[in-house]
């Protein structure tokens, strides 16, 4: 079985940002790319995450922190931090994402996603598709497409630190079948989990991302 592990543990001007001025979201995620930098990656990640969350009533917004003074300010209650690391996890190459979660009373804010793990998984999936043992939809998955469910998974760890793993995006391990479902637009968060996330967000009004906020 092809799988990777998701783990939880106790830039240009604003006009080029993935989150437009004046937009609203439940959480704003500051993105720091470590290693190889790609201006387009955060934009594409925003689109991919929005597609996965379409119809859920949940909105996550991203800001590319490369060269952005706003990212030097202290975090607000509605902000999280995502590190996109170019290589593999230092001790486990199958770990694609980690969330440094807190407690229900003091939730964590930091998650790391390892692009090297995503690339490794992508190559394995392409091999399965080319050998005709899996659907060719796997050949169409982009890096951002594959990053999106991992990032959403880690966000859940941060916002619901005591939540046991479940179905869909919230599985502890995604296998080839799940990546095919992603490619077919069928991999989602479960309805119950979505409701619990919305309950977390309802504790405060949505953020408005405006210049000089």
Locations of regions flagged by a protein language model:
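Acidic/histidine-rich, surface-exposed loop or edge segments in extracytoplasmic proteins
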Residues: 22-37, 130-132
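Metzincin-family zinc-dependent endopeptidase catalytic domain
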Residues: 39-155, 161
């Amino acid at each position: 079985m092809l799988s990777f592990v998701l783990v939880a543990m106790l830039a240009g001007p604003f006009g080029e940002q993935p989150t437009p001025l004046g937009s609203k979201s439940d959480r704003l995620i500051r993105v720091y790319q470590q290693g190889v930098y790609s201006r387009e990656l955060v934009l594409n990640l925003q689109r991919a995450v929005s597609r996965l969350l379409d119809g859920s009533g949940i909105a996550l917004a991203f800001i590319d922190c490369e060269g952005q003074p706003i990212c030097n300010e202290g975090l607000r209650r509605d902000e999280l931090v995502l590190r996109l690391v170019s290589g593999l996890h230092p001790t486990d190459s199958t770990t694609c994402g980690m969330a440094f979660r807190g407690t229900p009373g003091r939730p964590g804010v930091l998650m790391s996603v390892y692009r090297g793990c995503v690339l490794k998984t992508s190559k394995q999936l392409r091999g399965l598709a080319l050998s005709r043992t899996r659907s060719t939809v796997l050949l169409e998955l982009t890096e951002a497409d594959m990053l999106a469910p991992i990032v959403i998974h880690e966000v859940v760890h941060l916002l619901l630190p005591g939540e046991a793993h479940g179905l869909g995006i919230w599985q502890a391990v995604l296998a080839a079948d799940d990546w095919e479902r992603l490619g077919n637009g069928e991999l989602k968060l479960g309805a119950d989990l979505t409701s619990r996330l919305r309950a977390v967000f309802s504790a405060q009004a949505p953020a408005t991302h405006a210049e000089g906020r």
